[in-house]
Design a protein with these regions (language model features):
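Catalytic-loop of the protein kinase fold
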Residues: 151-168
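Glycine-rich ATP phosphate-binding loop
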Residues: 27, 36-62
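Conserved short submotifs of the Hanks-type protein kinase catalytic core
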Residues: 107-121
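AlphaC helix of the protein kinase catalytic domain
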Residues: 122-132
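Activation segment signature within eukaryotic-like protein kinase domains
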Residues: 139-140
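Protein kinase glycine-rich loop
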Residues: 14-21, 25
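AlphaC helix of the eukaryotic protein kinase fold
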Residues: 58-86
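Short beta-strand micro-motifs within the conserved protein kinase catalytic domain, predominantly
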Residues: 95-110
């Protein structure tokens, strides 16, 4: 896998299911009280996003200014996910279960954990099941419903693409 160490007691990483410009997403598993497995997705966003970003910032600003800028970015990301609370329960929007902000040992960065329901991406679903015309129409209607809900809450998605469209498992 990679060198990511999970800091969520009771949960274990099953696999990395995706990565993008804002972070990585892992499939998690936890035993429920009856011995069954409960699965979730965990998005991990690191601030700064890379050693390169860290080094470039350190070249152009003081450590104090860098820490303040990074903290501001963490607060911005955290605020975006708090906004998703207004959308919780909408049938066409992924539910975010909880969020944690984990400081790095050097106090010059953070990992943001966002635990959410585990869903199947549209490309994975289509390759496994295919889609007929009525499926495509329903998908379009569901997407419009989700985007309308976002608009009503002044939320702009900024990254709509097939890999960010999900289907219930």
């Amino acid at each position: 896998m990679d060198n990511f160490k999970l800091s969520l007691p009771g949960w274990e990483i099953v696999r990395c299911i995706g990565s993008g410009s804002s972070g990585k997403v892992y499939e998690l598993k936890k035993k429920d009280e009856y011995g069954g497995d409960f699965h979730a997705a965990l998005k991990v966003i690191s601030v700064p996003g890379s050693q390169k970003e860290y080094d470039e910032m350190l070249e152009t600003m003081s450590e104090f200014a860098m820490r303040a800028k990074l903290r501001e970015k963490v607060e911005e990301i955290s605020g975006e996910y708090r906004l998703l609370g207004a959308l919780r329960g909408h049938p066409n929007i992924v539910n975010c279960e909880d969020q944690m902000i984990i400081p790095h040992d050097d106090d010059m960065g953070w990992d943001i954990y966002i635990r959410m329901e585990l869903l199947t991406s549209l490309p994975d679903y289509v390759s496994e099941h295919g889609m007929n015309v009525s499926d495509v129409i329903k998908l379009g209607t569901d997407m419009c419903s989700a985007l309308e809900q976002c608009r009503e809450n002044n939320i702009i998605h900024r990254d709509i693409n097939p890999h960010n469209i999900f289907v219930s498992r």
